Amino acid sequence: MTALLAFVVIYLLGTLAIGLYAGTRVKTATDFALAGRSLPLIMIVTTTFATWFGAETVMGISAKFVQGGLNNVVEDPFGASLCLIFVGMFFAAKLYKMTLLTIGDYYRKRYGKSVEVLCSVAIILSYLGWVAAQITAIGLVFNLVSGGAISVETGMVIGTLSVLVYVVFGGMLAIAWTDFVQMIVLVAGLAIIAFMAGDLAGGPNKVLDLALTNDWFKFFPEPKLHDVLFFVAAAITMMLGSIPQQDIFQRVMSAKDAKTASRGSIIGGLCYFAFAFVPMFIVACAVLVMPEEAKRLLADDPQKVLPTLILNHMPFFAQVLFFGALLSAVKSTASATLLAPSTSFVENIYKNLRGGLTDKQELFAFRVVLVLFTGCVLTYAIMMRGTPIYEMVSTAYQVTLCGAFVPLVAGLYWKRANRYGALASIVMGITTWILLLATPLGEQFPPQLAGVLMAAAAMVAGSLATKPHTHQAHEAGHPEATSAPLHGHAHQ
């Protein structure tokens, strides 16, 4: 075992111990899924920031930046940061006050079980690519720090198991505790690495000159309709498509009060936006420090540019810092993306099939499904080996953008929105997206933009085509009953 690998193993065991200790405090399903709705502001900020700052931020976005500038990363970090800010501004307080366990519960309360199940399925499926990206990154880390002695696939299995153990025992509470520690390691580690990389490159001014020379600060597209449409589509994919995601919802709902939920999400988004530029700066330094090697890697395997700089051009302690920071980023995101779909499946699909569960039965079901989902996504990640990390992640959010975003917004902000409108929105949004994705039409007009526009149109048409329910007793019991269809209650 190399010294670097030994440090990585010690770090993994340390975070595992923290997670397991936190797990001793989990007594109920709410403790497991939402950390008992008790987290202070600092933990909401760190766990929100941690969820976003994953493998794609460290290795994916940074490589995309030096390949095409800011225009190439509009989706993440620009769209991703605004997503968290929008959640804090427009969604967190409203959803927190409803005391829900999952985002799927909102769809059931607002529109009924059919919408709950459809939106939950879309949300769960969207996690496949995101979790696969984190698992792939974990495998790559083990492969690199072992000098190739551990294959990427074996590393994927080891890393996934190290995350699974503490999430199974501690749920959201374990994630919040480990995220707090891991974000300290991440921020400190990458900040020191950035300082050292800048020094190797000849100072920040040289890096800035390189960026200006290569036009890397160009943000807006060419003034052509095709380019503008695809730019807008890329921006809204994570900006809006991530809003109805269970992992964000869990962090919002885990706060001790509504104000903390809102502030935590906004601050987390601002922190993410600021710090996402650090890996970009480091990779820009790599282009100056090792120009020929960086050029070759950018053409063959862009995700390895940053790790190669660290391994070949920096001292041992810098390598420990970097891989500690990288593992922190990957593990925090992986833990969140394993827990979120598992809780959604149990709460919004399994319970509908099986019927009512006691609190203990639900807690047990959360853990069993978590293990099963992890096994499935690990298999999927191994099968998808070779797909760029950034692409895995960006595709994931298109599902929820087209299927779940419009019903969420309309339900919160438009009283006339009803079950029929929501069903029409989901069906038309997803169908349009798939149609364009599977045909040459998708090269002319972005599939996700077409999908969300059709979803919005279908929501309006479907809701207005059905008269609102105005029965006085029904309205008295259900404040939002005016949005229910004439011949159907919202809880059917």
Where are these regions (language model features)?
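Membrane-embedded helix-loop-helix hairpins and adjacent transmembrane boundary segments
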Residues: M1-Q492
